[in-house]
Amino acid sequence: MLKRWLRPFRFQRPVGAVEASSRPSASPSERPAVELADASAILNLFNRCADVKHHTYTLNAREERSTVLFVFCEGMSDSQHMIHEVVLPRLHRFYECYGFTDAGMLQTASQLQLERLPDDDWQRKATQLVFEGKLLMYIPALRLICSVDIAKLPARKPEESNVEVSVRGAKDCFVEELAINAALIRKRLKSPSLAYEQMALGERTQTRIGLMYMYDIADPKVIQEVKQRLQKITIDGVFSATELEEMIEPTWALFPLMAYTGRPDFAVNCLTNGRFVLLVDGTPAALIGPANLLLLIKTPEDIHFTALSSTFGQLLRLLGLFVSLMLPAFWLCLLSYHQDQLPFYLLATLTVNRLGIPLSAGLEMFLALIFLEMLREAGVHLPSAIGSTLTIVGGLILGDAAIRSGILSPGIVIVGAITHVFGASLTNQALGGTVSVLRIILYIFSCIFGLYGFFLGVFLLLVLLASLQSFGVPYLAPMSPPFFRDLPHALFRLPLAWKRKRPKMLHPIDDTNQGEQSK
């Protein structure tokens, strides 16, 4: 009766369900890693890449199941040595003993460090691994795609930096390889407290980014904020550390909110103070944060000289910052609007020197500043021998010719030369570029409003500096807001015996400078 009553409600079994249900269920180790992949699908991923090579090998000529497909990128891997002397011999031994029957056994007994590709996103992972120098291995008998590390990426050896010249410090500097840069820091900081995390940014470039910090020193809130900003980045590619800095810091700041160095010894010094370091694959430098204005004044050589000489050099660089920024605008105010503030003999000399010059003082200063900026730009981008020759010869000859021809007065040329020399004391290139732009802005204010415009521009500049923060750390710290414990160490290079505390403005977990977790 029950069967007769349920007969009208019977459901038809879908087509193919009988065959699927009759198949024996595979164990987790026997299930194919990539069910939709085959040799043609893999090769189609790289059909437009001439540098990607593929070879098919047969481990046993009498068995069709012994076929293996190798795919690798020529020039980024040690294919000749690793494939023929390491990978193939071990696969031969494994196949003779076990055959291609179990993917799990292949991973454990083949003596190869195999990385199995995910089931759902094997195309993206396969392209990423091949262009990282890995060997992609496809076994049709197991429907398995895995990779073996045979990478040998183009890289150069660490050498002395051309920008941050070392006098007494270390000669090795960062290179374009991320692993080497991390090793240069790890070599100097042999502590398990040094945390190192990697991630990939860029939908197309998949640029590797390394984040390093001391987990028992650095402020956890700062590290968490850095990770969140990195995770929010969605872009096709990251090509330099400067682009990464622009994506994680506001672009309207004008001033660099992260320090930039090519010296691993300086990076290690910042890590032990509670800062973090960002390494970008392909960039021979590191980003350091949080950064403040006084950190950008320091140089890596400060820790390699005595306290007295380093303090004197740091004060000179601080003086160079203010002079190169404000001298042209201030001199223009005195020369154009407030001649009564100049000494009489100096005013008489300047007046005599300006006889016959057809240009106003403001236009003279503008031409001098533009001329010096062009010399600096040419000296930076030309080869070192040609750049130094052009800067010296061009400055001397053109400056003397401008005075003799009556285009520029000697006073304007001297002010421009002093500005250029004092600005050259700033070793941070990003800060130097910012000073050049702000110098022109102050010049415009002074040219229009005189001394009132000069002080207005300085006031607006101070307001901007006071409003900036780098990952929660005020840009003018420890001066504003005042951290009296940190102020002497920020302005001067005090003896090491006096430095028993880490900078309070960085909010370190372990604030003492006497070992791990010292109290």
What are these regions (language model features)?
Residues 1-326, 344, 465-519:
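Membrane-embedded alpha-helical signal segments
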